[in-house]
Amino acid sequence: MTAVQEERTTEELKALAERAGRELEDATALEILRWAAETFGDRFCVTSSMEDAVVAHLASRALPGVDVVFLDTGYHFPETIGTRDAVEAVMDVNVITLTPRQTVAEQDAEYGPKLHDRDPDLCCALRKVKPLEEGLAGYRAWATGLRRDESETRANTPVVGWDEKRGKVKISPIAKWSQEDVQTYVTEHGVLTNPLLTDGYASVGCAPCTRRVLEGEDARAGRWAGRSKTECGLHG
């Protein structure tokens, strides 16, 4: 972290993000992450759902030992926790696991069981959105694995943008990638992926709110199936 980075105001960071979004639109994912590493240093992190470790792997090439933030909601598939543990063991990253203030049992006691079925927005707010806001407090910029081809709600994702909700630079280095691009990178670099991706799941979230996708459905159709909800609140 440099003095210049520390002294940037919110307006300066916002202008930086908007300018970088334009200038880096045609850059490669690795070039985007190298820019992030050079610009923000240890005030930059990657968030990962442990669906795969592609962005974490890319970021480790740009900034060895980079912080990789993982939200343990208490509802994850065992395969997801296993992927996190494997990433921590074999990759040059520093995995930071965030947890909600309440355990699942404590939440059940206050709000009743299966809040995810009755009020999924509140459940996501308690177990994802709030913990991430607290966990990102010390960073200026964070990277995600969002891709434009995942759903209509993500079709306009910038490679670098401004996260108005959190007042941070938000970087989506693989926004322009297709699922085929992801698979090519995984194969070429031997990147860890969640075993559920080969078991019918195209997008992996909390176990109670995730199902396998059907042929012809978009990648996120298995999330909160049967509801209009398509995002947990972390990205929109």
Curated annotation (Swiss-Prot):
Active-site residues per Swiss-Prot or TrEMBL entry: C232 (nucleophile)
Main location: cytoplasm
Database matches in InterPro entries: PAPS/APS_Rdtase (IPR004511), PAPS_reduct_dom (IPR002500), Rossmann-like_a/b/a_fold (IPR014729)
Note accompanying the cofactor annotation: Binds 1 [4Fe-4S] cluster per subunit.
GO biological process: hydrogen sulfide biosynthetic process; sulfate assimilation, phosphoadenylyl sulfate reduction by phosphoadenylyl-sulfate reductase (thioredoxin)
Binding-site residues for [4Fe-4S] cluster, renumbered to this chain: C123, C124, C206, C209
Coiled-coil ranges (or none): none
Keyword Oxidoreductase among UniProt keywords: yes
Domain of life, source organism: Bacteria
Cellular component aspect of the GO annotation: cytoplasm
Entry keyword set: Cytoplasm, Iron, Iron-sulfur, Metal-binding, Oxidoreductase
Localization annotation: Cytoplasm
Catalytic activity annotation: [thioredoxin]-disulfide + sulfite + AMP + 2 H(+) = adenosine 5'-phosphosulfate + [thioredoxin]-dithiol
Pfam families according to UniProt: PAPS_reduct
EC supergroup of this enzyme: oxidoreductase
Cofactor(s) listed in the protein's UniProt record: [4Fe-4S] cluster
Record's function text: Catalyzes the formation of sulfite from adenosine 5'-phosphosulfate (APS) using thioredoxin as an electron donor.
Family: Belongs to the PAPS reductase family. CysH subfamily.
Protein name, as recorded: Adenosine 5'-phosphosulfate reductase
